[in-house]
Amino acid sequence: MRSKWIRLWATGMMWMGAMLPAAVTSAATLDCLIEPFRIVNVASPLDGVLERVDVERGDLVKQGQVLALVEGSVQRAALEIAEARAQLETAVESGQVRLDYAIRKVASNEKLLEEHGISEREVDDSRAQRDLSRIALVEAQDNKRLAVLDVQRAAAELEVRTIRSPINGVVMERILSPMEQTKQTPIVKLAQLDPLRVEVFAPIALLGKVSVGMAAEVVPEVPVGGVPTARVTVVDRVVDAASGTFGVRLELPNPGYRLPAGLKCKVRF
């Protein structure tokens, strides 16, 4: 009887031991670091002199917001000229008037030819003039379309000199100032703070127990009210042999930028 109870106790302990890794996993608390989701060095695609820079360190920016302008007085003048040309209607209007007149003249001459009032050659001349007027009108219409395209080209050349923010975020650093050359140098450095990125180095004991999509609580070193929840987005498939750890990345929503980047934290899976 006693041996039977011993066997039952041993079986129970083995069962509890088998369940231990899951309990350890669910209670795992690890050090982590909260970082910007991304850092972007914003530069100009062309060399030139900065005309103005509209942001300073700490400014909040929206995607598409103008950050700076590269000097573009020549391009602005070219755009104004192109717009003026595109608005001109005189060539098309005069071409239409000449064609209408040539058509009427052909009709009149053909009638006179039937009455033997003019020669065949005069009718041919009027027909040729009509055809030339039609070609001239088509050319004027083509030039009008080209003028519109020239406006688009000039506007695109000017837009290239307008440096816009590629993200919603905050200005970490203003690197260049007005009148400085943009040659291969970032103008401003931006950080995207919503969402944030949480970096963790987990021990190999958790390998296979942390997976993409898993939720985790993040406790920053500075209280922010409540415990935000992040989700695992990356689990490294290569282990660092020297430290016996592997990298885990989580994505932490940060509406209103209530959490600053750069904080140390604890993460609980």
Tell me what each language-model feature is:
Residues 74-90, 202-207, 231-239:
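Short, compositionally biased
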Residues 206, 221, 239-241, 247, ...:
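Edge-of-domain interaction segments
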Residues 2-16:
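Bacterial N-terminal signal peptides that target proteins for export
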Residues 214-229, 257:
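Low-complexity, intrinsically disordered
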Residues 17-49, 229-234, 246, 261, ...:
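N-terminal beta-strand block that forms a small beta-sandwich/beta-barrel module immediately after a flexible targeting
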Residues 62-167, 175:
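Amphipathic alpha-helical coiled-coil/rod segments that serve as protein-protein coupling scaffolds
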Residues 33, 51-54, 60-66, 157, ...:
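Surface-exposed patches in structured soluble domains
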Residues 28-45, 149-165, 188-192, 233-239:
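Short beta-strand-turn/beta-hairpin segments enriched in glycine/proline and small hydrophobics
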